[in-house]
């Protein structure tokens, strides 16, 4: 069995807010698997976010450009290893050039984007390789998303490392950017794992039910009641972790779905993406 280090224990504590000894026991039980350790903590009743703490070491720039008609948005995340590199001119210029060619050529995938030529004829990937050699850090496109909708609304957090795009539908031709920005900021802050209940990964649903049962069992609830209790906890998970069902942070008497419908009858979200470099 591998030895669990103090750094790993502290990392899990930072991710979950659980006590040091609880984190050590969970990591030991899981063999050092952080995702499994989080599930162990939750089964034992620890108040750990089901959405999972972000656990990346990337720095870089997340940029978004929306078309003039507001019906398409493109997000590009260009990552490096350290914050100082993300602020140098060569890195910023490459990020801007990649976005410009994405807007002009409309690639469907990251692979297609990487193969596109920039102004000097060399491809995006060749420029990335050159910059990696020049600065001594790995540079990579970690995310590229092209999103269509009746109205696409962007949000970039002030640190430039977190971006959200929201596609609205049933706008009725109305400018709904104000409501869309509220939704995008909600997604940035509350980290939903899916748009609505039906969009949650079935494996996640199964895991939440199992965790709910274990929590109820640990509380001494009768076996015959475990399924019902677990389904109740699952409904709370949906409320906490799916965007349309989350409480609106600006007015918790409403869900996001209700806020949108109040802004314009029938207004809703057809898609969203949240990308963070941290």
Curated annotation (Swiss-Prot):
<comment type="function">
    <text>Associates with the EF-Tu.GDP complex and induces the exchange of GDP to GTP. It remains bound to the aminoacyl-tRNA.EF-Tu.GTP complex up to the GTP hydrolysis stage on the ribosome.</text>
</comment>
<dbReference type="InterPro" id="IPR018101">
    <property type="entry name" value="Transl_elong_Ts_CS"/>
</dbReference>
<keyword id="KW-0963">Cytoplasm</keyword>
<dbReference type="GO" id="GO:0005737">
    <property type="term" value="C:cytoplasm"/>
</dbReference>
<dbReference type="Pfam" id="PF00889">
    <property type="entry name" value="EF_TS"/>
</dbReference>
<dbReference type="GO" id="GO:0003746">
    <property type="term" value="F:translation elongation factor activity"/>
</dbReference>
<dbReference type="InterPro" id="IPR001816">
    <property type="entry name" value="Transl_elong_EFTs/EF1B"/>
</dbReference>
<dbReference type="InterPro" id="IPR009060">
    <property type="entry name" value="UBA-like_sf"/>
</dbReference>
<keyword id="KW-0648">Protein biosynthesis</keyword>
<dbReference type="InterPro" id="IPR036402">
    <property type="entry name" value="EF-Ts_dimer_sf"/>
</dbReference>
<protein>
    <recommendedName>
        <fullName>Elongation factor Ts</fullName>
    </recommendedName>
</protein>
<comment type="similarity">
    <text>Belongs to the EF-Ts family.</text>
</comment>
<keyword id="KW-0251">Elongation factor</keyword>
<dbReference type="InterPro" id="IPR014039">
    <property type="entry name" value="Transl_elong_EFTs/EF1B_dimer"/>
</dbReference>
<feature type="region of interest" description="Involved in Mg(2+) ion dislocation from EF-Tu">
    <location>
        <begin position="82"/>
        <end position="85"/>
    </location>
</feature>
